[in-house]
Amino acid sequence: MTQLIVYEAGNPSHVLLQTSDFDVIAGKVAALGARIERWEARHPIAPGASNEEVLSAYGHEIDRLKRERGYTNGDVVRIKPGNPNWPELRGKFLQEHVHVEDEVRFFVEGTGAFYLHLDDKVYQLVGEAGDLLSVPHGVKHWFDGGPEADFTCIRLFTNQEGWVAHFTGDAISDAFPKYEIAA
């Protein structure tokens, strides 16, 4: 389920807010300059659909965001349980970093959590299938798909190189609860 948990940055055991009310989440996220939306596919996506079929199913929404925000390219990333590359990728995504462009992810399937580090708070934003999450450029953050990640995401970019992180060197993410997929 879509969820927002707000922590004190200096005291990860102190939860300031925990909610799964989408309207509350959308308001809090917008106040941070971030974005969350719910999308529906224009037509069903079959299991094992190609990347092109996935992108086509959400073409209307993707085109709208491209017009609004200047995104020039996108791709599909799929991580399934047992992926031998996930531990290395997870280690990289768990390091606090920033981007020179917004980090835009739409969850086609599965779930994952972005952690936004702003001032004296950390906002854990859990997205699920149907959620579009956008972290503004320059915002310190990290991502976790859990120990056995299971998600398919559409990613949108303005940078032709795709995902380029600038790591802060701050180990703050080590102090916060890792994301665990609810059973």
From Swiss-Prot:
According to the UniProt entry, its GO molecular function terms are: acireductone dioxygenase (Ni2+-requiring) activity; acireductone dioxygenase [iron(II)-requiring] activity; iron ion binding; nickel cation binding
**Pathway participation:** Amino-acid biosynthesis; L-methionine biosynthesis via salvage pathway; L-methionine from S-methyl-5-thio-alpha-D-ribose 1-phosphate: step 5/6
Can you cite a GO biological process for this protein? L-methionine salvage from methylthioadenosine
Print the keywords alphabetically. Amino-acid biosynthesis, Dioxygenase, Iron, Metal-binding, Methionine biosynthesis, Nickel, Oxidoreductase
Write down how the cofactor binds this protein: Binds 1 Fe(2+) cation per monomer. Binds 1 nickel ion per monomer.
Q: Which cofactors are required for activity?
A: Fe(2+); Ni(2+)
As recorded in UniProt, its EC number(s) are: 1.13.11.54, 1.13.11.53
Record bears the keyword GTP-binding: no
Binding sites annotated in the UniProt record for Fe(2+) = H97, H99, E103, H141
Q: Does the keyword Metal-binding apply?
A: yes
Catalyzed reactions per annotation:
1,2-dihydroxy-5-(methylsulfanyl)pent-1-en-3-one + O2 = 3-(methylsulfanyl)propanoate + CO + formate + 2 H(+); 1,2-dihydroxy-5-(methylsulfanyl)pent-1-en-3-one + O2 = 4-methylsulfanyl-2-oxobutanoate + formate + 2 H(+)
Q: Where is this site: May play a role in transmitting local conformational changes?
A: D102
InterPro entries assigned to the protein according to its UniProt record, in alphabetical order: ARD, ARD_bac, RmlC-like_jellyroll, RmlC_Cupin_sf
Q: Which Pfam families match?
A: ARD
Q: Where does the chain bind Ni(2+)? A: H97, H99, E103, H141
The site (Important to generate the dianion) lies at: R105
* Positions bearing the site annotation: May play a role in metal incorporation in vivo: E96
- Family that this chain belongs to: Belongs to the acireductone dioxygenase (ARD) family.
The entry's function note states: Catalyzes 2 different reactions between oxygen and the acireductone 1,2-dihydroxy-3-keto-5-methylthiopentene (DHK-MTPene) depending upon the metal bound in the active site. Fe-containing acireductone dioxygenase (Fe-ARD) produces formate and 2-keto-4-methylthiobutyrate (KMTB), the alpha-ketoacid precursor of methionine in the methionine recycle pathway. Ni-containing acireductone dioxygenase (Ni-ARD) produces methylthiopropionate, carbon monoxide and formate, and does not lie on the methionine recycle pathway.
Quaternary data: Monomer.
Question: What is this protein's record name?
Answer: Acireductone dioxygenase
